[in-house]
From Swiss-Prot:
The modification N6-(pyridoxal phosphate)lysine is found at K196. Its cofactor is pyridoxal 5'-phosphate. SUPFAM superfamilies: PLP-dependent transferases. This is Phosphoserine aminotransferase. It comes from Pseudoalteromonas translucida (strain TAC 125). InterPro entries: Aminotrans_V_dom (IPR000192), Aminotrans_V_PyrdxlP_BS (IPR020578), Pser_aminoTfrase (IPR022278), PyrdxlP-dep_Trfase (IPR015424), PyrdxlP-dep_Trfase_major (IPR015421), PyrdxlP-dep_Trfase_small (IPR015422). L-glutamate binds at R41. Pfam families: Aminotran_5 (PF00266). Belongs to the class-V pyridoxal-phosphate-dependent aminotransferase family. SerC subfamily. The gene is serC. Gene3D superfamilies: Aspartate Aminotransferase, domain 1, Type I PLP-dependent aspartate aminotransferase-like (Major domain). It is an enzyme of class 2 (transferase). GO terms for molecular function: O-phospho-L-serine:2-oxoglutarate aminotransferase activity; pyridoxal phosphate binding.
Amino acid sequence: MSKYNFCAGPAMLPPAVMKKAQQEFIDWQGLGVSVMEMSHRSKEFLALTKKCEASLRRLMNISDEFEVLFMHGGGRGQFSAVPLNLHQENKSAVYCENGVWSKSATDEANKFTQTTAIDVRNDTDGQFSIKAVADWQLPADASYIHYCPNETVDGLEIFDVPSHPTAPIIADMSSTILSREIDVNQFDLIYAGAQKNIGPSGIAIVIVRKTLLAREGLPKPGILDYALEAKQGSMFNTPPTFAWYLAAEVFQWLEQNGGVKAMEAQNIAKAELLYNFIDNSDFYSNKVAKHSRSRMNVPFWLNDESLNSKFVAQSNEAGLLALEGHRIVGGMRASIYNAMPLEGVQALVDFMAAFAKENS
């Protein structure tokens, strides 16, 4: 029986990448040692890091105007790093909130800098949506504008990119990076924890415009200092080498399978399959307006919530793993990142249909 992992993160990895990692685990490149045992400053590992960055630059069309950093701390580490690096005296950092993670970013930034929070959601009788970007009412002056294009808990995705005449645009793309094509030049800093579309947890990708590195910001730990990490080649201290290795393998897999354009087409097909089933069911429901629905994270509710435990238990028995919703919102959630095949979503839909028939 095939098993499909719908966990929000750490998430499913491409089976081909997992198999290659297994084959190379104790003997990488014929060197007789694991990549986990290699010096991060060895010529072999340095070659891997260069290959990894070049692959990501090709996948996302990242120009030389940006540095690409591989940092510790995941997304939450960047919640601290962004204000520490980009703070400006007598200016407020604007945080556009559309769910749990964007609110968490605001809360962390409040420890270091002045913030202005803007709720960019609509709530119409319990149905949530994202306001048009033109209606966000961003202030005329700000140290930076921060937003999260995809909220994994709430299942809300923002497809348009905000702009500002003077303030840099910062995006937490932890759950949407590499899932759809974007124009990197519309942003000044993009960060992403790896554990959804890139690899295992333990590393964060930061794509930062070089001109931003000149900002003094606030006193900060070296491992959160963008300018220092750029100068040191992301090796101010020992990096998470195995996570970096697996990120390189995932990037190679993406390039071999049509790149971001192909991933986007597949992700649209997967999301449409699942949402269409939910919308045409009187047993399940979703609380997000169609134009604001996440392609990566699909929360849904059983109309009879007394069946929740039974649904989770039987879905696990059917090889459909980690479907229980986030504790904050309840219900169910299917996270369908790049590595999730269409067959996995079809298996979920088939199970949901059978469960509804059995329990109606």
